[in-house]
């Protein structure tokens, strides 16, 4: 079945462009977070940027080449504070998983492109998790809970690996002397 000239082709192009732009926005947002002293949030923006690159690649690989013309709207945002950037990122992820990709999946299904429909649905699941993470990080920033928790916790220095136990991080790491911005909650995920 030929993809060329279908609505699915246009949707794949729009999704490819959207994911590519999100990737770039997230790298810009990472720089802003780093400047504000949020090393972990910067790393999460970069990790998510890499995820978006892979989503874009998945959509791109379905395309059959040549030129295609379509009309689409994209966010003409700006680089704000970390809180503003987290909010904008969460809104973009929400738009993808709740509206765009389900609609694109339905059209692909109708047109007989079952593998494309499945890709849109699977990627939507990832975008849900991206939104959740951004909203939780936004809540932490807004409530001053990035480097301080209500209960004692184990923190790790992202630079040297030092573990600190307590409700908040020290002003600087006693091992490597990096500022508190390098601490994050330690998660044993291995």
Predicted segments, located by residue:
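Non-heme di-metal
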Residues: 1-190
């Amino acid at each position: 079945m030929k993809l060329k000239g279908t609505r699915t082709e246009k949707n794949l192009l729009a999704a490819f462009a959207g994911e590519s732009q999100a990737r770039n926005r997230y790298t810009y947002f990472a720089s802003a977070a780093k400047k504000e002293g949020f090393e972990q949030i910067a790393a999460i923006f970069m990790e998510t940027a890499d995820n978006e690159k892979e989503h874009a690649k998945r959509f791109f690989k379905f395309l059959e080449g040549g030129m295609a013309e379509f009309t689409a709207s994209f966010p003409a945002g700006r680089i704000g504070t970390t809180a503003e950037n987290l909010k904008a990122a969460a809104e973009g992820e929400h738009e993808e998983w709740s509206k765009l990709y389900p609609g694109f999946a339905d059209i692909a299904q109708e047109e007989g492109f079952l593998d494309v429909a499945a890709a849109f649905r699977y990627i939507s699941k990832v975008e849900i998790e991206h939104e959740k993470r951004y909203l939780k990080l936004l809540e932490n920033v807004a409530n001053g809970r990035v480097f301080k928790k209500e209960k004692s916790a184990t923190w790790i220095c992202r630079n040297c690996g030092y573990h600190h136990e307590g409700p908040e991080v020290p002003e600087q790491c006693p091992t490597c002397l990096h500022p508190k911005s390098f601490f994050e909650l330690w998660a044993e995920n291995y």
